[in-house]
Amino acid sequence: MKLSKNDDIKLNIDSLTSEGSGIGRFDGFAVFVRGVVPGDEVVAHIIKCSKNYAIGVVKDIIKPSEFRIESDCPVSSKCGGCSFRNVSYDEELRYKKGRVQDALERIGKLDIEVEEIIGADKCSHYRNKAQYPVSICDGELFAGFYAYKSHRIICNDDCALQPKEFKAGLEAFRIWAEKANVTSYDENTGKGLLRHIYFRKGFATGEIMACAVINGTSIPERDLLVSLLREKLQGLKSVVININREKSNVILGKESKTIWGDDYIRDKLLGKTFVISPNSFYQINHDQCEKLYSKAMEYANLNKNETLLDLYCGVGTIGSVSYTHLRAHETCADL
């Protein structure tokens, strides 16, 4: 049977793509379906059919996989931010290990046994940074994340991956936008003021930065925004506007202005303190980062007679947490 658009077919999902879409085969023909789990038996509705593959959406789950779990996010099926919220964590780790093993063997032609993945102790509310695109509907600001392969915003002010404080920060921005008649940026026209709302948190210090990314040089009622953020956002240390007037989908511009508090927040990794600005590169998952760096230092087995070059290093976390093991170190972000 030849597949055509709008066909409904039964599929057994046997694997996943790197982006988390399920793969099933219909008479040997690959069909990609989002939101499914290996082991699922589903009815898929075909929405695109090409010479070598088809894309479908789930119409019905006939028999759920043993690895399927209930997603803890009400918008995970629409939002493009997560791929594995409906898969057990053990199965997710097994799949990711398999992807690494396959890449080494099939692409790298290397005969290397991949060790077990060191999993996270915390799979929710672990991210220390969030960048929310915004829009305004009927005079009210809403923020969220882009739908899968789209710039359509899925409203989500309570993401399961972000610190709970960020929700309170979004509420402060919503009230300010309504009272100050703030317009949202339109990518098609290049008009509108507010492009993104951006938060950073130091997990070890509790310090939070709130940032408005704007298509302009200033914001209306800035004292009101600061007052609302200070009232609602526990741990607030910095309020910044980032200026991005480019007609592009790049989130941050090169210039930032602090309108309250410090120009940065602080965080600690493995006992070392780091200063983080709006544009700093810094690892997203604090606790997993500490595990990663500790394991890297264990494997490197550095000694006092060695010199470590820390290149393309963001805020220099790897070199800084390693230098106590060394005679000298060089941190250079621009080399």
Q: What residues fall within each predicted segment?
A:
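Accessory RNA-recognition modules of RNA-modification enzymes
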Residues: 1-327, 333
